[in-house]
């Protein structure tokens, strides 16, 4: 019984310390890097490579009104994805951005604006994620993503094995 009491007390203490540390974090509300976006010359080949060769299951895909695939997400881990989009003349092949999962978009954008970042408008994507973008001085785009329960990302995370 004494061992159980010590275990419970230690667990409660650990949770309290973790909560305190997170509340004092300079990046409070940032969950972590969520995805990397890549424009690819052949979407079917890229999906085949990432699913068959790399073993990353397809999480979801988004099509436009005419049925053309706009993007495919493959899932690396429960909360990490690779976003694949067809390359075009306007979107050449290569890595286009990285995505950062945030708990609350309003809080995250306010924090980054206060720090001097030029934060783009907040939108809701076709995947039902709430998005905003920041471009760093080197031209690298960071996509902030809040993932509500209705978002395809959150649904894929919940289905993860």
Give residue ranges: language-model regions:
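Vicinal oxygen chelate
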Residues: 2-7, 12-29, 62, 73, ...
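Core segments of cupin and vicinal oxygen chelate
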Residues: 28-31, 37-81, 114, 122, ...
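Eukaryotic phosphotyrosine signaling hubs
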Residues: 33-35, 95-97
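Short hydrophobic/aromatic beta-strand micro-patches
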Residues: 39, 99-101
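Short amphipathic alpha-helices within nucleic acid-binding modules
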Residues: 48, 105-111
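Short, charged/polar, Gly/Pro-enriched secondary-structure boundary elements
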Residues: 79-83, 139-142
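Amphipathic N-proximal alpha-helical interface segments
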Residues: 84-88
């Amino acid at each position: 019984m004494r061992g159980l009491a010590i275990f419970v007390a230690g667990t409660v203490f650990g949770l309290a310390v973790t909560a305190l540390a997170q509340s004092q974090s300079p990046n409070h509300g940032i969950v972590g890097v969520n995805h990397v976006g890549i424009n690819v010359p052949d979407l079917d080949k890229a999906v085949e490579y990432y699913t068959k060769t790399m073993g990353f299951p397809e999480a979801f895909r988004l099509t436009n009104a005419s049925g053309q695939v706009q993007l495919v997400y493959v899932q690396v881990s429960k909360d990490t994805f690779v976003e694949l989009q067809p390359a075009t003349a306007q979107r050449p092949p290569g890595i286009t951005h990285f995505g950062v999962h945030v708990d609350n978009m309003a809080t995250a954008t306010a924090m980054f604006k206060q720090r001097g970042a030029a934060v783009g408008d907040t939108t809701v994507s076709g995947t039902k994620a709430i998005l905003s973008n920041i471009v760093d001085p080197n031209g690298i785009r960071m996509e902030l993503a809040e993932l509500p329960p209705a978002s395809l990302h959150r649904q894929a995370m919940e289905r993860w094995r």
